[in-house]
């Protein structure tokens, strides 16, 4: 019923989807009574369409309170996405239950984050290369200044702020761990490292695990909040069906 209500909402209030439905002869009544077996009849939305219309005709005329965020850009150019406040709250709870809980950590533990937010200009090579958010006990590390010359400052941020677990871009967390190892430095033992946004290879996982002496957990989906795939304590990548219905299609839009 929630899915039907959402589809009707897009027909009534979102110009982009209403036009797409009508071009295929899909009417409001069909959406109000759609069955799971009929989902394949709905048009899919491409990343290019999301980039082009995400801040215009894809927005609802009855927009609830929220804000714009950028996706990680792991598949190319970052996408500008509007996030309603209530969606952020619900997805935060899901992340706590299905990602952090499975990794044995929580949002109240001091954490380190390596993401796309620019906390200082890329050209500015002045310490520190992190900022501390006292309210969330979060140390936000710059993803744009990681190098052999700066890694000692990253390690200092982890130690001084008593970081218990790390999260963020897989490649950035790997580079931090790799440079720490190559510099012969010793990192504190963490509870877990949770990666996202980029492919985590076996080599990357091993080096991160060796340096921080903890398990590494992979996860996918965040900013878009349209699904959630996370790694369990058994090392399985699992889709959370209560977050959203996930369909797998190839580059031609055919089901696989």
Predicted feature residues:
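Active-site glycine/GP-rich loop and adjacent strand/helix microenvironment
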Residues: 1, 6-8, 133-256
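Flexible, active-site-adjacent loop/turn segments at secondary-structure boundaries
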Residues: 24, 37-40, 48, 79, ...
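Intrinsically disordered, low-complexity boundary segments flanking structured domains
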Residues: 24-29, 37, 98-101, 125-132, ...
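Short, charge-rich amphipathic segments
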Residues: 81-93, 111, 131-147
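A short secondary-structure junction signal
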Residues: 81-83, 123-125, 178
């Amino acid at each position: 019923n929630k899915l039907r209500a959402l589809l009707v909402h897009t027909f009534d209030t979102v110009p982009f989807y209403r036009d797409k439905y009508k071009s295929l002869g899909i009417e409001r009544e069909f959406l109000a009574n759609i069955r799971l077996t009929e989902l394949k009849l709905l048009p899919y939305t491409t990343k290019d369409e999301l980039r082009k219309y995400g801040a215009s005709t894809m927005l609802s005329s009855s927009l609830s309170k929220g804000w714009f965020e950028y996706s990680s850009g792991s598949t190319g150019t970052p996408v500008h996405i509007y996030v309603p406040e209530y969606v952020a709250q619900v997805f935060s709870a899901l992340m706590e239950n299905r990602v952090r809980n499975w990794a044995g950590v929580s949002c109240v533990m001091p954490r380190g984050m390596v993401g796309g937010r620019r906390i200082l200009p890329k050209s500015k090579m002045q310490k520190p290369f992190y900022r501390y958010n006292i309210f969330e006990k979060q140390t936000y590390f710059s993803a744009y200044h990681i190098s052999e010359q700066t890694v000692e400052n990253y390690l200092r941020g982890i130690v001084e702020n008593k970081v218990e677990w790390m999260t963020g871009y897989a490649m950035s967390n790997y580079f931090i761990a790799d440079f720490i190892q190559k510099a012969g430095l010793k990192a504190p033992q963490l509870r877990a490292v949770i990666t996202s946004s980029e492919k985590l290879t076996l080599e990357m996982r091993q080096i991160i695990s060796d340096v921080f002496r903890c398990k590494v957990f992979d996860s996918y989906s965040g900013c878009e909040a349209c699904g959630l795939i996370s790694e369990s304590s058994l090392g399985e990548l699992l889709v959370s069906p209560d977050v959203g219905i996930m369909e797998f299609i190839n580059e031609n839009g055919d089901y696989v």
